[in-house]
Every structure is written in C-alpha cells, then in structure tokens.
A protein has these predicted regions:
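A short, structured N-terminal alpha-helical element that caps or precedes a catalytic domain
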Residues: 1-102
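Short, charge-rich amphipathic segments
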Residues: 8-17, 47-48, 60-67, 124-144, ...
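N-terminal [4Fe-4S]-dependent radical SAM core
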Residues: 93, 97-100, 120-168
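N-terminal alpha-helical segment
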Residues: 108-111
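Canonical Radical SAM [4Fe-4S] cluster-binding loop centered on the CxxxCxxC motif
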Residues: 165-179
Length: 179
C-alpha cells in the first residue's frame, strides 16, 4: 500500500495514474499509518513545487525534488503545474524502481492530441519532438509514433468541415492500466 499526501487534490488522479504505471495493482491510503510501503507527497509553495517520497517515516534527500521555475503566477496554470509535478514524480519513480516508461509521464491523455494540436498551430515536427521530450520525457519511438499518427489524422481531417458538421467519436481503450 502506498500513502498519498497531496496538498492540492486536483492533482491526485494524475499522480495516482503515474504511480499505477510503476506499481500496478497497489492500493492507496490518504493518511499516515502503519504498514505502508512508502508515501508520496506534493507541496505547492510560494516559489516552488516539491515532490517527496517518504520511506520508513523519513524523507531522504535523494528522493526529494523541487522545481523553482514554477512561480506563484504559474501555479494558476493547472496544466503547466500538473506537468511539472508529473515530470518530477516520474523522475523520482524511475530512479527508485529502475524502470522507464515509453510514454514518460504521459497518462490520461491521447498522445496524438498533443502532437496534432501543435501541428495545427504550425509547429515544426522537430519542435514538437523537443516539447514532448522535455515536458513528458517520452521516448523517441513514442514521440515519432504520435507525430506520425497526428500527421495522418491532420491529413484526413483537413478536407472535412468538422467544426460545423457532425463528428462521431469511437472510444477505444488505449492503456489497460488506466481504463
């Protein structure tokens, strides 16, 4: 069982999905109690976001990360703050477990949506690659795959007037660990 001590609950689902990638099948507690393997904690401060992993009641320095690039004005941007928290948790969990996930810290979103949005905004493929590598720590293979699929999707959607017409969305589960 893993303890979740999260200062702002709006990030709990994102953190739990990331933990599920590294520790499938684990259960979670929202309080300090005996019998937990370890705790994960987020702290949103005035000048930084911190994430910690607590083991045996102590928070070793090796499992604490802070990102001071996230200033208070940026904390109002939920998406940017979430990405910083998830990236820091991913780095800590990868170091702790020795595992790396091919999609990096990406959970709960269709990866091609990120690439497609940027292609539609006129971004170059190399800029999308850099963004996905820096923001989500995704592998080169998965970044290439998402850009390739997004380019195909863009080509299919360009001749359609999908903004004023009708769309049919068929949801197909992508990741069995979160669906």
């Amino acid at each position: 069982m893993i303890g979740l001590l999260i200062q702002d609950n709006q990030y709990e689902q994102d953190i739990r999905e990331l933990l599920m990638s590294f520790y499938p099948g684990e259960t979670y507690a929202h309080e300090v109690k005996d019998g937990l393997g370890f705790y994960v904690e987020t702290r949103l401060g005035d000048s930084a976001v911190s994430v910690l992993i607590w083991e045996n009641g102590a928070a070793p320095e090796g499992w604490k990360l802070s990102d001071s690039r996230t200033r208070p004005s940026d904390l109002s941007d939920h998406s940017a703050t979430k990405n910083v928290i998830k990236k820091m948790f991913y780095l800590m969990l990868a170091a702790r477990t020795g595992k790396e996930m091919p999609w990096g810290s990406l959970t709960g979103i269709r990866p091609t949506k990120i690439a497609l949005t940027r292609l539609e905004e006129g971004w170059k493929e190399e800029d999308i690659r850099s963004f996905m590598k820096e923001t989500y720590l995704a592998s080169d293979d998965k970044i290439d795959l998402s850009i390739e699929i997004a380019a195909r999707e863009k080509k299919l959607l360009e001749p359609l007037d999908y903004e004023r017409g009708y769309s049919l969305y068929v949801g197909i589960p992508f990741c069995p660990t979160t669906c």
